Design a protein with these regions (language model features):
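Bacterial N-terminal signal peptides
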Residues: 14-21
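Bacterial N-terminal signal peptides that target proteins for export
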Residues: 2-12
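N-terminal low-complexity, Pro/Thr/Ser-rich intrinsically disordered segments
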Residues: 32-58, 63
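N-terminal short leaders/motifs
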Residues: 39-42, 47, 106-121
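Bacterial lipoprotein signal-peptidase II cleavage site
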Residues: 22-35
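Second-shell loop/turn segments in exported
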Residues: 51-58, 112-121, 150
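A cross-family detector of function-defining hotspots
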Residues: 44, 62-107, 121-180
Length: 180
């Protein structure tokens, strides 16, 4: 005698298991292993997100008071494109205000831009080496408005990290981090 309910139950079980196997193994998968994130990339871009550069003790958004308390008096100072600039060994910081001297800059004036020497931030390579370390930039271009420098830009959380090179084959000339 044929046990019809048992055959139906077994058939249903086979269909359910086959469906789970078939649809549970879809072609859509995360490709995290295809995009390796090295620690240098992760650390550098995380610092940029927070307005900081490796080797610079202060970040974007720090006040004049915080800068002087943490780093001390600058080697040199004066006005520049973005505001009053203070120069230290290996980097400079630009405040949002203009002034004739550091004493005239408000204590609450904030750092809006920093320039650093490549050695200070530990990024001394050619453009391809920088891309290898940090990934593809948000933008790369030849700046023909002045000294024909080659630029790599990385945007992260409202901050812009810029690497300037004399050419596509030369090492980093300087590194800039600024508010967008």
């Amino acid at each position: 005698m044929i046990d019809l309910p048992k055959i139906c139950r077994n058939t249903l079980l086979v269909v359910v298991l086959s469906s789970i196997t078939l649809f549970g193994c879809s072609n859509v998968s995360e490709k995290t292993e295809d995009i390796p994130v090295n620690s240098a990339q992760s650390d550098t871009l995380e610092k940029v997100k927070n307005g900081q550069l490796e080797g610079v003790l202060i970040g974007i958004g720090a006040t004049k008071k915080e800068v002087l308390d943490k780093i001390g008096n600058p080697i040199e100072s004066g006005n520049s494109e973005y505001g009053f600039t203070v120069y230290y060994d290996g980097f400079d910081l630009q405040f949002e205000d203009y002034a004739n001297s550091i004493d005239e800059v408000k204590d609450t004036s904030k750092v809006v831009l920093m320039n650093a020497e490549p050695k200070t931030v530990g990024m001394t390579g050619k453009p391809e080496e920088i891309k290898k370390n940090l990934g593809e930039p948000s933008r790369e271009f030849m700046d023909d408005t002045g000294d024909n420098t080659f630029i790599l830009e990385y945007e992260n959380s409202g901050n812009l990290l810029r690497f300037a090179f004399d050419s596509k084959e030369s090492p980093v000339k300087y590194v800039t981090l600024r508010v967008q």
